[in-house]
A protein has these predicted regions:
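Thiamine diphosphate
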Residues: 1-162
Length: 162
């Protein structure tokens, strides 16, 4: 397990996360070791918003992980369920559509991600260096408990952190 995987595993254990809900993603798979907690694979990101909401209201910590293109697909689920009903959980978002992107369909959502999160009144934190993943996820959990709404942690490709 490399350092970033270890940092994420440390945060998951420290925050007593019981479930990680995810749509398979090559960027996220480089950060996450599925053996550290119960992993639920989703076919669509919207499923994760509903499941994470249900787990949260039943006092079971969950993290939802998705690509930023998937965030675009489920923004209404956040806006119509989690925000009005004060259901907060951490959402880890892999960032596609950057200058290393080889798939042009990812670029528009790459450009829109931060503004989209802000537009629904949520906070996001960006990971900019290897050593701040644990601290950032811990800060996101504190924010979730304080404001009872989703908090997003934006993860770049590992190449941006080296």
């Amino acid at each position: 397990m490399d350092d970033l995987n270890l940092q994420l595993a440390t945060s998951i254990k420290k925050q007593e996360v019981k479930y990680v809900l995810t749509v398979p993603c090559t960027i996220l798979s480089k950060y996450y070791d599925e053996s550290i907690t119960q992993t639920i694979y989703l076919s669509r990101e919207e499923e994760g918003v509903g499941l994470a909401s249900g787990l949260t209201v039943s006092n079971q910590n969950a993290i939802l992980m998705m690509q930023n293109s998937g965030l675009g697909n489920c923004i209404n689920a956040f806006a119509s369920l989690t925000i009005p009903y004060n259901i907060g959980f951490v959402v880890i978002v892999s960032m596609r559509g950057d200058e290393l992107e080889d798939n042009p369909v990812q670029i528009p959502m790459g450009n829109a991600t931060k503004a989209l999160i802000k537009s629904i009144g949520c906070k996001y934190y960006e990971i900019n260096q290897d050593n701040d993943l644990t601290a950032t996820i811990d800060k996101a959990f504190r924010e979730v408990h304080l404001n009872e709404r989703p908090v997003f942690v934006l993860l770049p490709r590992k190449e941006h952190l080296q």
